[in-house]
Amino acid sequence: MKQLYDKFSSDVSVKLTKAYSTSFSLGILCLDTEIRRHIYAIYGFVRLADEIVDSFHDYDKEVLLKRFEQETWTALDEKISLNPVLQSFQETVNQYKIDRDLIKQFLHSMEMDLKPKVYTNTTYREYIFGSAEVVGLMCLKVFVSGDDQAYHELKPYAIKLGSAFQKVNFLRDIKDDFGVLGRSYFPNIQNQDLDHASKTAIIDDIANEMNVALHGIQRLPASSGYGVYLAYKYYLALLNKLKKTSVSKILNERIRVNNFEKSLIFVESYLKFRFLRYR
């Protein structure tokens, strides 16, 4: 019967991830079956924590996040949880021996979101490390099947990819982050302060990180390479759309990659991965 609960828990993480991110879900679907559920487990955990600080406005978020953090450590220690998302997450963390410091840094970044602030260069880097880079490192542990040598060799590239993805999210979501949640992640830039020069600097920084990250993606095992490459190509397409979009439009609407464009990315990415090895 425990196996039935484990499957149920895994299914919950899958549904949670798919409900909130169709793009990531598509990338995960292109991973080998053996590792797919573990990446869903990581993203289910991340999504639930993020939801606490982003959506539960009528409740005491600080209390809820603290409780979630305590339940996380209990689940990891006892290797069981009555929360299905934490159950599937603890199974993945314990199986792949994911460093708990990564989880601690992630939860710290969620705490940073509890109080609106304008970020400095230092707090910006701190937030990106905890909210995105460590998530990439958790996934990397799964991608390399816990191989420490491969993990350390690919770690710098995973960090760059996580950072680039998060910065694209920041630029895409700048309207809602500032207007609804009172957050401004880019250092010393509030919503109305974004101009063409600052937008260009942000995009150039992201493009440089994406270029570095690609070298790491090319070295991933076949079991994960295509799925990660697909996510990379999606974010690259979104970055290019943001680059071509005026600042005023970015500040007033959420820029998206439409379904037709996603279909083209899917086909192109598969052909490049299968026959051209990413060229």
Regions found by a protein language model. Give the residues of each.
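Catalytic cores of Mg2+-dependent Asp-rich isoprenoid enzymes
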Residues: 1-167, 171-279
